[in-house]
Amino acid sequence: MKISLIAVGTRMPAWVQDGYQEYAKRLPKELTPELVELPLAVRSKSTNTQNAIASEGDNMLKHIGSNTRTIALDVLGKSFSTEVLSQKLADWQMDGRNVNILIGGPDGLDSRCLAQADEKWSLSALTLPHPLVRVLLIEQLYRAWTILQNHPYHK
């Protein structure tokens, strides 16, 4: 099973890349995540935000394969505990399909991406800096895996 984090935004600060890589390398080979970075659409005072979101959505939809489980991160999504995430991870492994996790740009995900998602998750009711979401998400996936392995990291 492959987990793809499909994220809008490139050229992240070094701390984001370092944090992401630290947790990604800790995951076992069968769960090694793939980070797909998509360019952020140009935004200015004269551009329409909805057009930028739609452009990012077009790009994101091209990376969603058939017969995959797709999860969209959205402020209106469902929130849950790390323990519940660990059970979801176990279920994904049993299911065998690849998993896509969609991380939108600063203005969120295109409605077509949300419509294609099997699940919508909210990481927090707080507004999080866009780059931090990648690090937070990969850490939580690692933590969920450690729970399944009875590894002391979670304790």
UniProtKB/Swiss-Prot annotation:
**Subcellular location as annotated:** Cytoplasm
Query: Which key words are in the record?
Result: Cytoplasm, Methyltransferase, rRNA processing, S-adenosyl-L-methionine, Transferase
Q: Where primarily located?
A: cytoplasm
Q: What is its EC number?
A: 2.1.1.177
Q: Which InterPro entries match?
A: Alpha/beta_knot_MTases (IPR029028), RlmH-like (IPR003742), tRNA_m1G_MTases_N (IPR029026)
**What Pfam families does this protein's entry cite?**
SPOUT_MTase (PF02590)
- Provide any one GO MF term from the record: rRNA (pseudouridine-N3-)-methyltransferase activity
Catalytic reaction equation(s)? pseudouridine(1915) in 23S rRNA + S-adenosyl-L-methionine = N(3)-methylpseudouridine(1915) in 23S rRNA + S-adenosyl-L-homocysteine + H(+)
Class of the enzyme per the UniProt entry, highest EC level: transferase
Q: Where is the signal peptide?
A: none
Keyword Magnesium part of the UniProt annotation: no
Q: Where does S-adenosyl-L-methionine bind?
A: L73, G104, L123, S124, A125, L126, T127, L128
Cellular component aspect of the GO annotation: cytoplasm
What does the similarity note say? Belongs to the RNA methyltransferase RlmH family.
Q: What does this protein do?
A: Specifically methylates the pseudouridine at position 1915 (m3Psi1915) in 23S rRNA.
Q: How does it assemble?
A: Homodimer.
Protein name as catalogued? Ribosomal RNA large subunit methyltransferase H
Species for this entry: Saccharophagus degradans (strain 2-40 / ATCC 43961 / DSM 17024)
